Structure formats: structure tokens, C-alpha cells
Amino acid sequence: MDMSSANSLRPLFAGYPFQGQGRVNQLGGVFINGRPLPNHIRLKIVEMAASGVRPCVISRQLRVSHGCVSKILNRYQETGSIRPGVIGGSKPKVTSPEIETRIDELRKENPSIFSWEIREKLIKEGFADPPSTSSISRLLRGSDRGSEDGRKDYTINGILGGRDSDISDTESEPGIPLKRKQRRSRTTFTAEQLEALERAFSRTQYPDVYTREELAQTTALTEARIQVWFSNRRARLRKHSGGSNSGLSPMNSGSSNVGVGVGLSGATAPLGYGPLGVGSMAGYSPAPGTTATGAGMNDGVHHAAHAPSSHHSAATAAAAAHHHTQMGGYDLVQSAAQHGFPGGFAQPGHFGSQNYYHQDYSKLTIDDFSKLTADSVSKISPSLHLSDNYSKLEAPSNWSQAAYHAAANYNAHVAQHQLNDYAAAAAHGNPASAYSHPLPTQGQAKYWS
């Protein structure tokens, strides 16, 4: 490409026609940095506001920023003038013409008089409401600026020398009455209204249009006020309930503790016998490929045998051993732990044809474990009537009650027989193998898959 062809290229965008300091705002309006808006645009803003047009609509139609529109309207409401250049706006007049005339006379009599001296003289002369010292000083400065001493006008128009510098007072003060927007007062609810709103909020946090109409009729409130109240009430509920349910797991948040523990790996965990059946199964997770065997149950027996206080109802479902204040065989459990009897010796919960503790936990459901625990504790510790309470509950439709009661009776017989054998073994110091019975393997129905 030669130089002639390169010089012949022209940019696609040649710039705006006004050039110079002109800029385009977000709304597409043209403005010049440092220059106030033209007077006709200021006048149009005031006229549109007086006709009831909102400032946001004025901003879009005239392509002037919302902040500029608000500033012009506020200054016009305070001073009655749309002339630019007075930063912060001038203060409205608070003195009467008689006081201004008297202040001007006192100043002419003594040009070096102070503002506080003028105020004292006004009070002595009997003026009922004399202006403050700052107001008198402002009047004195205004009269100095108004004097014909040839000083320059240091307003923005005077400095910039714009085309609006020769605007007359009638153009800068159009005299259009502009209504000040009144702020809505806060709504005060009566006790009856709050009670009706709270009742509706307890039913639903997001009322539909029919609920809002009904509340509007009963409470004599507008639907808009009702909608705002529900929004604020939901926010208050989220604020107060943000950290109240921290630390609760889904398994044990709704269950109630009945003082039953499971001795797993030497620890006792409280069981919640509530809506979900068991509340602390989430705390145990056996290693992959392993099952809970008698070793862990022996640890549970030893831990339960050293329960320190009678105020705790700690027991273990592994050995089904309850507190010594509720079970006379407390010494039996302790001696069994010392002689090394097999774990699960007093456990009548060989539910079905398999021992629960020799089963993988993944093969059990919550309902299976709940029935197993309730039956085991009730047979070993007669003071806990969980089996009676459980029989009063509504049973699922897929349970075989006849098979369950048959298995429960058989387990009770085996448990009593084992307790008698181990009591004799503990009394004579014989080894446990001489009295141990094989686990029941037939005659019962299985309750898990």
C-alpha cells in the first residue's frame, strides 16, 4: 500500500458535529463539562414537574441525568429561581421589609457598625422578631454586592460568559407554583390488625390476592400496606431464625431422647425414639466390608457397667443392660464383662433367624432397628415399657404383626434362659463356654431383606 492510498483513508466515525468539550451522557443527551444546562431546558424541567410529570420521566424525555433534574427542582423549590451559579442555593428571606429598611438606615448612619450592634438596636427599638446576627450579616453583604462599584459578577454565567448571561429576572424566576412532594407517614397498626395479620402469616407467608382482599376488608388496610407488612414480616423471620437451628441434623432434630444407648466401639450414643424411629444412627458408620461384631458389644457392656450416676438412664442396646437402679442384675452384667462372656449374651434381639449385630447396617431399615431396640430393652429392663408404647402406635400396613409377636415371644424365652445360665456361671466361677447357647437360627421370620 503506497502513501497516497494510505492518506486517502478516512475514519468511519468523524466525531460529533459540536466538537470541542461536548460529551454525550448515558441517556444520549449532549452536555459540555463545566457549563450549566441552558435556561430553556431548566425552564422545561420546572414546567414538566409542575404539570405532574415524575423526575424519572423528565430525565428520560429531556435526556438529562436524574441527579441534575433533582438538583434543579430542589433549588427552585427553595429559592424560586432556575438561575445557575449559586452553590447550595440562597436562603429564603426571613426578615420583613420594615426591618430591612431600618437595617439599611443604621448602616448608612454608621458604615462600620457590627451585625450584633444592629440587632441590639432593633431589640431596643421594640421590633418583635429581630433577625439573627447571621441574617443581618447576609443582608449587609447583599447590599454591598448590589452597590454600583463596578465590581465583576463572579457567578458561573459571569465567569464563563455564556449566552445565558443576559437572562432577565423574569426568565430566571418563572414563578411557576411547584408542589412539594409530601412524604408518606409511617403506618401504625392497631392490636386487632396485628393479630389478624399474624394469624394469616401463621397460615401462609405468601398470601394470594384473595387472602389480601379478605385481610383488607377485615383490617381496613390497603392491599399495598398488607403486602409490605408480609414482606417485612418474612424478613424479620429470616433474621431471627438464621442461626437458631444450627448444629441440628435431620436425623435428631425432631426426635426425643428416651435414655437408651448403643455401645458401638466403646461409646454410648443416645437414641432418639421419635418420628424417624432412631435418632443417632448417623453417628455410626462401620468400615466398608465390616460388620458390628461381639467385640464392639463387649466394649459397650464394659462402658455401661461403669455408669457413674443414678441420674443418668444410660444403657446399651448391645448388651441391653440398664441402670442398676432399674435392673437387679447390674452385678451380673459387671461380672459377665469381667469373665469375658460373649458379647450379646443378654441380647434377646436375634430378630428373625439372624443376629442384628452380625448383620451389616446397610441391610437394616430404620423401622427394623426401632422395633428391635424397643423389644430388647423392654424384655431385659421391665421398668421401660417401650414395647407397650410401641404397640399403641400406628403400624405400617406392610408389617406382619403375627410373625412379629411370635418372634418376640421366642426371643423372650431365649433371653430368660440365657440370663439364668450366665447367672449360674457368674456365681460358680465357671467358664462362659459351659453355659453358652448357640444363636437361634430357625423358627422365626426375617424382617429385613
UniProtKB/Swiss-Prot annotation:
GO biological process per UniProt: nervous system development; neurogenesis; regulation of transcription by RNA polymerase II; segment polarity determination
Assigned protein family: Belongs to the paired homeobox family.
DNA-binding region(s), residue ranges: 20-143, 182-241
Cellular component, GO annotation: nucleus
Top-level lineage group: Eukaryota
InterPro entries: HD (IPR001356), Homeobox_CS (IPR017970), Homeodomain-like_sf (IPR009057), PAIRED_DNA-bd_dom (IPR043182), Paired_dom (IPR001523), PAX_fam (IPR043565), WH-like_DNA-bd_sf (IPR036388)
Compositional bias (Basic and acidic residues): 141-154
Name under which the protein is recorded: Protein gooseberry-neuro
Organism: Drosophila melanogaster (Fruit fly)
Location of the region described as RED subdomain in the Swiss-Prot/TrEMBL record: 98-143
Compartment(s) where it occurs, according to its Swiss-Prot or TrEMBL record: Nucleus
GO molecular function, one term: RNA polymerase II transcription regulatory region sequence-specific DNA binding
Principal cellular location given in the protein's record: nucleus
Renumbered residue ranges of the record's region PAI subdomain: 23-79
Pfam families: Homeodomain, PAX
Residues spanning the membrane: none
Keywords of this entry: Developmental protein, DNA-binding, Homeobox, Nucleus, Paired box, Phosphoprotein, Segmentation polarity protein, Transcription, Transcription regulation
Positions of post-translational Phosphoserine modification: 165
Tissue: Expressed in a single-segment repeat in the neurectoderm during germ-band extension and later in single neurons during neuronal differentiation.
Biased composition (Low complexity): 306-320
Segments of this protein annotated with the region Disordered: 127-187, 294-321
